[in-house]
Amino acid sequence: EYDHGYDVGYGPLTDHVFHPTDQGGLIIETGMPNSGKTDFLNDLTCRLMAKTGRYVCYLSFEVPDKDKHIAHLVQLMLGKVNTVNYTQEQLKPIVSFLNSHMVHLDLHEVSPTPDNIIARADIVRRSLPLKYLIIDPYLFMEVETNRYNTETQAIKAMLTQMQTWGRIHNIWVIIVAHPRSLKKQNGKNELENIDMYTISGSANWANLADFIFSISRIKRQDGNYTRLDMLKVRDQD
């Protein structure tokens, strides 16, 4: 029987996001700087933990402090920006749940190479039923480039390594990747649209990923909102 995946916690909106299975693989999130990519992933993974009980590991260069990260996720779980009116007793079970379901990947003294990230994530995987590894953003990863190994080749090797590890262990690896410098559209004072081929460094982002989506902030006079565009879905009905 075909596995149509599970609800990521957005209710009816899930149909417009995606239905991941427990197969694992590679998901890429892209978007302009300050477009809300980290905020969306925090919200998504918060819902995944709360609604499905899945375990998430973060390698977050954006929010490296786990306590600050938990404080933000508590706000998301409560739907309140200000939690000052909640007592410690009220907050304790939420903090305890998050503390047990989310892990911050601590690289300590080692550089953030694909090998080191996977080695540390393997330690987490052996102690918890890990389902998601978040790398936010790719910009801070170190991939080896030299005269014999171009950036395109290095990115392809990194993506293949992450995807293979994810599929072997049924873990979704989500990598946040910025677009290259976008060109202005002819005759318009607007930048070209982001798609899966505008991700910086290599077309292999588009070629190898199982899912790709972009996040953008839309500002209008009648209100602001966040927009998600699903750019690639592999083998899903």
Model feature map: region roles:
Residues 10, 66, 88-95, 111-114, ...:
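Amphipathic alpha-helical transducer elements in NTP-driven molecular machines
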Residues 19-21, 50-52, 95-98, 123-127, ...:
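Conserved catalytic network of the ASCE P-loop NTPase/AAA+ motor domain
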Residues 1-79:
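The Walker A/P-loop phosphate-binding site
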Residues 27, 39-43, 71, 115, ...:
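Feature representing long, continuous alpha-helical segments
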Residues 52-149, 157:
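Conserved inter-motif catalytic segment of the P-loop NTP-binding fold
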